[in-house]
Structure formats: C-alpha cells, structure tokens
Amino acid sequence: MESKGKYYLTTAIAYTSAKPHIGNNYEIVLADSIARFKRKEGYDVFFQTGTDEHGQKIELKAEAAGITPKEHVDKIAGVIRGLCDLLNISYDKFIRTTDEDHEKQVQKIFKRLYDQGDIYKGAYEGMYCTPCESFWTESQLVDGKCPDCGGVVKPAKEEAYFFRMSKYADRLIKHINEHPEFIQPVSRKNEMMNNFLLPGLQDLCVSRTSFTWGIPVTFDPKHVIYVWLDALTNYITGIGYDADGNSTEQYKKLWPADLHLIGKDIIRFHTIYWPIFLMALGEPLPKQVFGHPWLLMGGGKMSKSKGNVVYADDLVDYFGVDAVRYYVLHEMPFENDGNLTWELVAERTNSDLANTLGNLVNRTISMSNKYFGGVVENKNVQLTENDAVVDADLKQTVTGTYAKVVAKMEELRVADALTEIFGIFKRCNKYIDETEPWVLAKDEAKADRLATVLYNLVEGIIIGASLLEPYMPETAERIAKQLNTSLRDFDQLEQFGLYESGSKVTDQPEILFARLDMKDVAKKEAELEEAMIKAAAEHEAEEANAEAEKAEQEAIDIEPKAEIEYDDFAKMQFQVGEIISCEAVPKSKKLLCSQVKIGSQVRQIVSGIKAHYSPEEMVGKKVMVLVNLKPAKLAGVLSEGMILCAEDAEGNLALVTPEKNMPAGAEIC
C-alpha cells in the first residue's frame, strides 16, 4: 500500500506516583488501536507514550517508602512499561522525563523563554494542591477545595518564575476559532474558551522551591522547573527537538503532532498552556487535541479504600488481553464517561466474543471439516432467487463495512467503529440461519450450494478479522491462522472473493473465547475487593504510624514572650464552643464569621482562617474559645471572642479541639 505520509500520535505520559488502574490504561489502549489502524491505512506512524517522573507528590511518596525519588520512579516506570507490554501496546517510543536528553532540553527551553522575556521572576502566594501539583487563587476554589480533584489545598508562598500567559492569549483564541478541529470533542473546546480564555489568563507559575525532585533551573538552581513545563515538552523532546535550533530530521519530519490523546481532566494544560509554550518557541501547534472521557468503576471513580480499583493485569489474567481491549474500547462513549465492572466485562465477553464471534468461527470451520474435509471452495452457486438475494446482501454488508469504519475512525469514534465491524459477524450468523447448511448437506444435489455458503462465510470472517486487527490483534491472527490464510491489507477489504478457493482450514478449531460462569466471575471479583480493602487499611495504618512518628520527631521553637503572673492568666476564660454556622466575611480574603454555641449563649466570632478551612468544614466542630476577650470589629463585623488555633513553621493553621467529646460551654482549665 502506498504511504499516506506521517502520523505522529501521543498519549499523556503516565504519572509515576503509583501503579495505574484500568481507568488510566484505557487511554493507552485507545491510542494503540488508532496507531494500528493508521498503519494499516498506509500511514507512517510514530506512536509515543511514556512516564512523567518529577514533582512534589513523587518526592513525598518516596520519602514515605524510605527510598530515593529515582528508585521510586524506576520501579513504577517499570510497572507501567510492563502493563503496556501486557496490553499489547505497539508504541514506537517510551520516553521518561528523567531521561538525560529530555532534562537537558527542558533546561534549555526554560532558559530561552527567560532570555526572550516570556518568563520572569516573582513571588507566588496562593492555594496549592499537592496531588494535582497546581496553584489556585481563592476565587478558583470550589467549596474551598481543589477544583480539579476536590482535595484539600494549603496556602503557599514562595519565590517563583512565571510565564506571561496573557501575552499569547489572543493568538490562541484566534487559532482555536480558525481551527475547529483543534480541540475535540467540541464540548471541551467550549469549556476552555468560556471558563479560561475569554475571562482572561493569569500568568503561570513555572518553578518551585519548596521541593527538590525536579529539573533545576540552570541559572538559579534552588528552583526546579514546574511539572507542566517539564512534562508537556516531552512531545517534542522525545522526537529530537533542540531549543538551540539543532533539531533532528526526525523532529522536522514528525512535528507538528497529528493527535494528542489525553484525559478530559488535563485538557486545559494541553489546549492552553502547551500551545502557548509552543507559540513562544516559534513552533507549530499540534493538529488536534482529543480529551477522552473517563472509565468509571460501577458508575463512580475508582478508590482503593472502597475496594473498587480494577487493575489491567487482574483483568487480563482472568479474561485475556483481547477481551479486555475489546471491552474498554467498545464500552467508552465518545464524550460521556464509560462504566466497568467485572460482571459487565463478563457479560460482554459472553455475548459478543464467545457467542457472536467465537461461535461463528467455530461453527464455520467445524461445518467445513464435517462436509468437505476442511476444503473451502468457491463454487459460486445460487439455486434459487432467494439464494442470490441473501448472497448479495451478505457481500454488500461485508464489503461496505470498511468505508463506514474509516469514517468512524476519522472522528475517533472507536466504539462505533467496533460496532460496525461486529455487524459483519452478526450478518454472517444471520446468513447461517438463512441458508441452513445442515439442511443443504442432506441433499447431494445441493453440495455446490453448500460449498458456496461455507466459502462466503469464510470470506466474510477473514474480512471482518482484518478490520478487527487494530483492536484485537491476537484474536485476528488466531482467526486467520485457523482459516489457513493471512490478514488482508485495507485496500483489499472492499473486494469479496479473494480467499483462495481450495484452501484447507484447520481440522482442530480452537475456542477463541470460552463462555464464563457468572458465579465464578462474582467470586473472583469479591476476592479481589476483599484483598484490596485489607491492603488499603494496612496502608492507611502504616501511613498513620509514619505520620505519628514524624510528628513525635518534629518540634518547633518560637521566640519566648515575657513571663506573666498566674493572676494574669486567671483573668482569661476559656470554654469549649460548638460552631453551629459559618460564612465568609464579604470582601475579605482571610476572615470567616462563625456562630458559636457556648453553654446557653451563641456568640459571633470572626477568625482569620479562611485560607485553611471552608465554612462548610467549620460547621459542627468543637473548638477552644477565649470567651472574655473584649469585643471588636474586624472588617466591619463584630467579633465576641477568639477561636484558638495552632500554627506550624510553614504558617499552616489547625483548630485546637478537645481530645474527647465535651459539651459546648465546658470550662478549659
């Protein structure tokens, strides 16, 4: 087949904090099916994936495990690469952000952007989410928590370098409007435009000083380069980009990328930050960024503590690699989230793979052996007008499917493409019911018609298997082997009758997919859930013990104040208060106003803890209150006491609460 040119495809690189679950692996399987399909179409495909290995979260994970960050990422990167191999992923490059050539290029990119004025030095003060490694302003928080993951954020203030995002915002808006295919699906484009670009971009923090596990800034080594500027550039460093203008021929051939395939949760970074970085470097933008939906577990996000995390290796061990590939590709809608449970995988395996496909192949080969010793000949005989009609309809369905599949794949509607392919197998099964080979076999005069029917079935199956290859490569090869033929190139799939007449199929057909006992499936799932919950509980206990040991080892010295007399202390009245309601003080960035029940009274107390607690988190807490503090107005709001807090060396505040449950109003003495 004549080459159609290059096709450069990437996935988001996997974060090496922990072993990924099947929801994470979905993306790499989706990308692999696209890469394989494009290769069969005649494109010169380069498929890159890899691992994102820097950041504070990894540093903390390694510290908790008592190993170095490099040891941690080496281990997890090995696990991720092993899962790629297990899932039969045909990547061309596996990049790691700890690769020496990548790190050097990131440093050169940072220096170049700094030298040309796109990066400047400043100071950052805001709310930081460690799991997402993202800074947020208070206005961006949702109920006081990270808008991306819903996790706890902490105030952070540090010297940092910033990228001038607003400088390129108008250019990016123009590009998006002029290239409607750039962000897909369209709903993701609308989200980026309305929520981020049109309201105005803020400058982006691109370095950190509060941790060390990252790529140092060459001219200011106490700073490490922020994860997104590090991770995103893998798409160009992995194919030979050089910030000094000495990029490789491979880079010149492959860039711009034809497709960045990513999860919908990181589309902002890939459709705003990344294209702006490229504009600053004077490089073309990727042709398309596709934000795929999530694969949920039983309708909810996967959680180890709930015991509902599903790992690819467990699924493959039980169902087989192609059954897993088929399920995650077939069950993921174009925009909405998909759903996975062991029961659903088993049901789909039984209905589509064991019955529709496996039974069809087995019956066809078995009948060929039974009636003709395995020899398949094209007699091209129709005995009746109806024979001609059903043969023509079968051939039209089989040869017309390729164009439909190509159209679906052009839109990245992979699930729909698979549905079209299985339409061939369903039509073949219907053809068996229409032609009734077992009836034809009873009449020797109809032997040539019987041979024609079996030939048509074999021809339909091999065309379907050839289309199926990008999605289920092992299964497609097994089918071709049993039919004693080869999988076909795509330019042959609109022709019917290329199977060599007189070929002999295997005399021992194998079961492609065995039917599964649903009771056994449920038992296996329950065993894994129980083991996971137990492991999660043990892990939480270990973390709690580690935190306790760490707390015992930590101590803070503060500057002592002047001594006071006991009588001075005795003047202060401390009581337990219960917060019954709380709200933010208007026009204040720091203050919360709480209604606090103390005995039979309710007092209004204003506290500067908005950066540490949301109003919702405050309600219901038992706190220690200085009751007889003289009332005062804070930001125009009357405060009738003081809620006590502890403060660590980093300025983090924690409410002081009684160790045991005490009634509101109990005296603290």
Regions found by a protein language model. Give the residues of each.
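A glycine-rich helix N-cap at a beta->alpha junction
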Residues: 78-92
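N-terminal catalytic cores of NTP/NDP-binding nucleotidyl/phosphoryl-transfer enzymes
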Residues: 2-76, 95-111, 115, 132, ...
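Phosphate-backbone binding interfaces of nucleic-acid-interacting proteins
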Residues: 548-669
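Cys/His-rich short segments
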Residues: 116-169, 173
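Short secondary-structure capping/junction motifs at helix and strand boundaries
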Residues: 88-96, 114-127, 139-140, 154-157, ...
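Helix-rich, typically C-terminal accessory recognition domains appended to large enzymatic cores
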Residues: 121, 344-380, 397-505, 626
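Intrinsic disorder at enzyme termini
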Residues: 476-568
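Structured secondary-structure scaffolds
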Residues: 2-49, 101-105, 155-370, 417-421
